[in-house]
Amino acid sequence: MAKFIQHIGLVAPLDAANVDTDAIIPKQFLQKVTRTGFGQHLFNDWRFLDDAGKVPNPDFVLNLPRYQGATILLARENFGCGSSREHAPWALTDFGFKVVIAPSFADIFYGNAFNNQLLPVTLSEADVDTLFQLVKENEGIEFVVDLEQQTVNAGGKSYAFEIDPFRRHCMINGLDSIGLTLQHEHNISAYEKQQPEFLR
């Protein structure tokens, strides 16, 4: 996994609360088990006016020219609620998002995001309100999300966020569960050598 230390990116404001996983990636697109190819179906029922996904909805935020290429999604409370599907962070990352900022996240989505190198940043509702206003008033504004410092820098101000130290360590060092295990490979090998022959 790639290391996540700091990210600078264009911000897209999704001004809706309780965005569930079925809105993020509708169930009809869940047949695949690989992590790629889901970005084209991200927010499918909102991004497109037809079932085939060929007629863009000109009013949806991700279709607006000013937000093309956004890598930071600004959202409202309880983002990622609904059914447990890892496809939701897969779709967001495949579309190009690196960070989601919101006042709160559904627990399962929150964990799945970290497992897929998508950083969920929790800020207060007041701070998120300020950031929405900032994005709407300043076309092309970029945020600096610094995981080492645990800050979001925008509009000349810094907004601090909390994060579990273990998850922070994993993202900064680009470690998934396999990478974490390999960090202790020498200890595992030493333990195995101490075992009786028939257990090796």
Swiss-Prot record:
Catalytic activity field: (2R,3S)-3-isopropylmalate = (2S)-2-isopropylmalate
Domain of life: Bacteria
Record's GO cellular component terms: 3-isopropylmalate dehydratase complex
CDD domains according to UniProt: IPMI_Swivel (cd01577)
Protein's pathway: Amino-acid biosynthesis; L-leucine biosynthesis; L-leucine from 3-methyl-2-oxobutanoate: step 2/4
EC number: 4.2.1.33
Gene Ontology molecular functions: 3-isopropylmalate dehydratase activity
GO biological process terms on file: L-leucine biosynthetic process
Enzyme class of the recorded protein, top EC level: lyase
Keywords: Amino-acid biosynthesis, Branched-chain amino acid biosynthesis, Leucine biosynthesis, Lyase
Keyword Amino-acid biosynthesis: yes
InterPro entries noted in UniProt: 3-IsopropMal_deHydase_ssu, Aconitase/3IPM_dehydase_swvl, AconitaseA/IPMdHydase_ssu_swvl, IPMI_Swivel, LeuD
Similarity annotation: Belongs to the LeuD family. LeuD type 1 subfamily.
Function: Catalyzes the isomerization between 2-isopropylmalate and 3-isopropylmalate, via the formation of 2-isopropylmaleate.
Known partners and oligomeric status: Heterodimer of LeuC and LeuD.
Listed name of the protein: 3-isopropylmalate dehydratase small subunit
Organism: Yersinia pseudotuberculosis serotype O:1b (strain IP 31758)
UniProt lineage: Bacteria, Pseudomonadati, Pseudomonadota, Gammaproteobacteria, Enterobacterales
